[in-house]
Regions:
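Small-residue (primarily alanine) positions within well-ordered alpha-helices
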Residues: 9, 13-16, 26, 52, ...
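Short beta-strand scaffold segments in enzyme catalytic cores
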Residues: 24-32
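Short, basic and Ser/Thr-rich N-terminal targeting/leader segments
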Residues: 20-24, 70
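Conserved Nudix-box catalytic region and its N-terminal flanking loop in Nudix hydrolases
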Residues: 44-47
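Residues that line or immediately flank small-molecule/substrate-binding pockets and catalytic motifs
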Residues: 42, 76, 100
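Zinc-dependent deaminase
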Residues: 1-19, 67, 80-147
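Short beta->alpha transition motifs characteristic of CBS
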Residues: 35-42, 125
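Helix-adjacent hinge/juxtasegments
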Residues: 49-50, 54, 58-87
């Protein structure tokens, strides 16, 4: 099931790629059903907050009519930044599944261990490496084309 949901997140990343946004996608899952999805839309929305994970969390919160997404998991093609990691914790998401590490901005294991901090009022568990090569490939090809 993890691969299936990460494939859905990759679809969102491909949409971002086609729109010339950084190709990161995310889906929020509850009871094996996608209740929220998103891709980076920072350029489209002129908003630093329009990251894939936050877009997916916002959609799921609207559907659930609750910002607390207890019993939910989130799948992100790339390791979340601090902004998204805080949103994941604040929304009480149970599990974070990551496609590939982000060596420059990743706040889960690459640049920080944000989810392991003791000051959080909620513990989100994480796993890295779901469809890692596919997730790496899309973001690397995007930035290669930009250079």
């Amino acid at each position: 099931m993890k691969e299936l949901f990460m494939k859905e997140a990759l679809i969102r990343a491909k949409i971002a790629f086609e729109r010339d946004e950084v190709p990161i996608g995310a889906v929020v899952v509850k009871n094996n059903e996608i209740i929220g999805f998103g891709q980076n839309r920072t350029i489209e929305k002129n908003s630093v907050f329009a990251h894939a994970e936050i877009e997916a969390i916002n959609m799921a919160s609207k559907k659930e009519q609750n910002y607390r997404l207890i019993g939910c998991d989130i799948y992100s093609t790339i390791e979340p930044c601090h902004l998204c990691a805080k949103a994941i914790v604040a929304s009480r998401i149970d599990n974070l599944y990551i496609g590939a590490r982000e060596p420059k901005e990743g706040s889960i294991v690459s640049q920080d261990n944000f989810l392991d901090k003791l000051f959080h009022n909620h513990k989100t568990h994480y796993e890295i490496g779901i469809l890692e090569s596919e997730c790496k490939e899309i973001i690397q090809s995007f930035f290669k084309a930009k250079r």
